[in-house]
């Protein structure tokens, strides 16, 4: 069963020149987001640019959130990653979706109008409530972290 999420088109090219975000296959977890820029853009090495996607979403359900994640080929082949690593879209946010793109390569990267640059994934959210304690119950792991379990 699919959960309905409100989507607002902010750029008229979405739905006419470029498709609405959609799952590419029945097993896809994410929907591609496109660079809805006005002209070709070059992202220089080390530079970060904020790219509009041409859409806004309103998740509305506090048990869900959306995350903007990189497309694997962009980082691996071109050195283009998200400037904030992961973009979190809270259920009550209604503004435009923007993608922060960082060129971590040594070469300029050309972004064309409508290029697919990231993906949108919806995830479940559990809102926790803290319970103050003086000590934790003992666990097998304890305070071990940052390499505590080894590499083998």
Curated annotation (Swiss-Prot):
Q: Which UniProt keywords apply?
A: Hydrolase, Magnesium, Metal-binding, Nucleotide metabolism
GO biological process assignments: dUMP biosynthetic process; dUTP catabolic process
Please list the cofactors this protein needs.
Answer: Mg(2+)
Q: What is its EC number?
A: 3.6.1.23
Pathway the protein contributes to:
Pyrimidine metabolism; dUMP biosynthesis; dUMP from dCTP (dUTP route): step 2/2
The enzyme's main class, written as a single word, is hydrolase
Record-level Gene Ontology MF annotations: dUTP diphosphatase activity; magnesium ion binding
Keyword Transport annotated: no
Where substrate binds, per the record, is at 71-73, 84, 88-90, 98
**Pfam families reported in the protein's UniProt record:** dUTPase
* Membrane-crossing residue ranges in chain numbering: none
Known catalysed reaction(s)?
dUTP + H2O = dUMP + diphosphate + H(+)
The answer on whether this UniProt entry bears the keyword Magnesium reads yes
**Which HAMAP family does the UniProt record give?**
dUTPase_bact
Q: What protein family is recorded?
A: Belongs to the dUTPase family.
Protein task: This enzyme is involved in nucleotide metabolism: it produces dUMP, the immediate precursor of thymidine nucleotides and it decreases the intracellular concentration of dUTP so that uracil cannot be incorporated into DNA.
The protein's name in its UniProt record: Deoxyuridine 5'-triphosphate nucleotidohydrolase
The organism of origin for this protein = Shewanella loihica (strain ATCC BAA-1088 / PV-4)
